[in-house]
């Protein structure tokens, strides 16, 4: 009987670990914004930006997202709206001033799920770091809109960051093949 118990214990541990899933956090910067009025702190998207928002929806169409987060700006909301409508999700607003607390909330509320975050050039990489990942690139410039980051947090807490692109390529974007991330 003791041997049977040990046998079941040994072979059930890997099964129970496999049943638990990694958490996936997808991060993008908002799509192209109107820049004709430098005094406008909350601009809309350009036509190219609206197209990129549709491209984001296409990129994530097979993913079962549990939640979509964005900052309280028109450009982030408009970037997220097409995918939110397709997935029948209500966009949740987050405060980019406290990314550590936001990352903790994501990991606590969405363990084993898939999350989309639409942020800004000065918050996306910082959010990756707050989630425990390493920056795969040093910075996102003002004219780069096509980066798509995936942060996978395993059940054991290991963090893996990958990046690529979506939609039309931004000229100055670093190729995902030019930089490897551990």
Task: Mark where each language-model region is.
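Bacterial Sec-dependent N-terminal signal peptides
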Residues: 1-22
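Residue-level preference for the first positions of well-ordered beta-strands
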Residues: 25, 114-118
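Long, charged/polar, surface-exposed segments that mediate recognition or autoinhibition
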Residues: 121
